Amino acid sequence: LAWEGENQVSTNYVASWGNIQSLYKNSQIRNWRDQYNADFVVVIGSAQSSSGGTTCGIAGSIYGMNDVFPDHDAYDSYAYNITANNCGDTTLTFMHELGHNMGLGHSVRQGAEGGVYSWAVGYGVDNQFATIMAYPQEFNTTNQLSYFSNPGLALNGERIGVNNVADSQRALELVTNTIANFR
């Protein structure tokens, strides 16, 4: 990923599904995206609180695609997210929401049926850690790693992914060329 921070516009968005939908439809934002050749649009906004909890980020995603990465034209419209700058670790939230944009889902324990691939999900080990796409509280920990699930890496002897079960790194390798050609 490359960050070109000079292409910034001020907004007052909060992390909500309604605001993500308005981003998709906003012709000015689409024009800026085209003008700056942005593969993704990330809006730094604020958290959305409700009786169900606090939403620190929200993203367009392609869950449940049954191991078929959609063609360029269909998928590129999902490449928007809102990340709150007033809610937890903004960097991890930013990475998590981009993970959704790139076809990754939460952990199997959270009920994820995968992202673009059935195994494109987060991973965690009870009382030890959770990877970027997994919620740490589901694994009784506060230790969220700044890694996507990857069976090729280990932390204190524990693999941070499982082949064909939780391997976000492999999924990202497979979708890289499609994403790079969005703009």
Predicted regions and their residues:
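Extracellular (secreted or membrane-anchored) zinc-dependent metallopeptidases
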Residues: L1-R183
